Amino acid sequence: MENAAPRDGMFIHLSNGPEDPHRVLMALKMAEVMSADKDVLMYLDIEAVRLVVKDAPDVSKEGFPSSLEQIKKLLEAGVIIQACPTCLKVAGYSESDLMDGVVLANKEKFFTFTQGKTLSIDY
């Protein structure tokens, strides 16, 4: 029996926050689509960290599920969502303010979340 090829990965970088719903929701939708058969890691920095704190606004735009709905679905699907610790601090938050399932960014995880090739997309 042959070993299965390692799954490829998708690294999605999101720096825009609630003020840009189209970019936010497109990044989350792309993570959902790719997670069907790829390993996915989302890295949120700059303004995007405000999307994954416990009191995050529920960003919406016609044609997309809301941000809170998508984030919940992604976490349930095993997508890794990491928040930049420095950006979190600058925004006035700490690790304890993150939604359950969202973690502080870990540079080692950037290189180990998948065993296959990695494609990166930036929003």
Where are these regions (language model features)?
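Loop/turn elements at helix/coil->beta-strand transitions in domains of secreted/extracellular proteins
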Residues: 7-9, 37-40, 80, 116-118
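A short aromatic-anchored loop/beta-hairpin motif
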Residues: 77, 82, 95-99, 103-112, ...
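Short internal beta-strands
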Residues: 31, 40-46, 82-85
